[in-house]
Design a protein with these regions (language model features):
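Preference for protein termini
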Residues: 1-203
Length: 203
């Protein structure tokens, strides 16, 4: 994975502003997805052409009208930022379908801490070690209390370029790493096939 020996340092004031902007942006994207898969007011009001929605390769027609648990569709967003000539932060792109890179952040930070402990001692570097646990907590928050299923991280398999990340995140979250062939649906529920029998999957 990519490793930058001299990572970009962002001061706390800038970071607070970036976080506020990213939270606002992801909330707006969440509202947009809820509308596009629900009442479609943005299309009806002419904000976005219906043709653009219907011909988009990422538009999943089978989930139109389905309200996800807790009403949330976005649990992890990959937002690429750049700083322009004037020093302002700009969004280069959003990735909501299959964002990657979280494990790289965690592994890079752990490596940097071992490589340059004095830099971490002399600066108040924000801790990111809990990021995978925050993701796990966000996923489990949508599961009803009575549900005894597990969390499964679905991966295309070892041949996929992001497989190492999938394995690392699953391990960090305490989730099961599965491929499509490991899963079946029965009685309107997803089950994971294991050597010990079928195990329900909650998320």
């Amino acid at each position: 994975f990519p490793f930058d020996l001299l990572p970009r340092m962002i001061d706390a004031g800038d970071w607070v502003e970036i976080v506020a902007g990213l939270v606002q942006r992801v909330r707006a994207l969440e509202l947009f997805l809820s509308d596009i898969y629900g009442p479609r007011d943005a299309v009806a009001d002419g904000v976005i052409p219906n043709t653009l929605v219907m011909t988009c390769g990422g538009y999943l027609r089978p989930v139109v009208g389905i309200e996800p648990p807790g009403g949330r569709r976005i649990y992890l967003a990959g937002v690429d930022l750049v700083r322009d000539d004037s020093g302002q932060w700009r969004v280069l792109e959003d990735n909501l379908r299959n964002p990657s890179g979280l494990s790289y952040v965690l592994q890079n930070r752990a490596f940097m801490r071992r490589l340059m402990p004095e830099a971490f001692a002399s600066h108040l570097v924000a801790n990111v070690d809990h990021a995978a646990l925050l993701l796990r907590d966000a996923l489990t928050a949508m599961v009803p209390d009575e549900d005894a299923g597990c969390i499964a991280l679905l991966s295309p398999g070892p041949w996929n370029a992001a497989y190492a990340e999938h394995a690392y995140l699953a391990q960090q979250m305490g989730a099961e790493l599965v491929e499509g062939r490991d899963l079946v649906t029965r009685h309107r529920r997803v089950w994971m096939q294991t050597t010990g029998g079928m195990r329900p999957v909650s998320v």
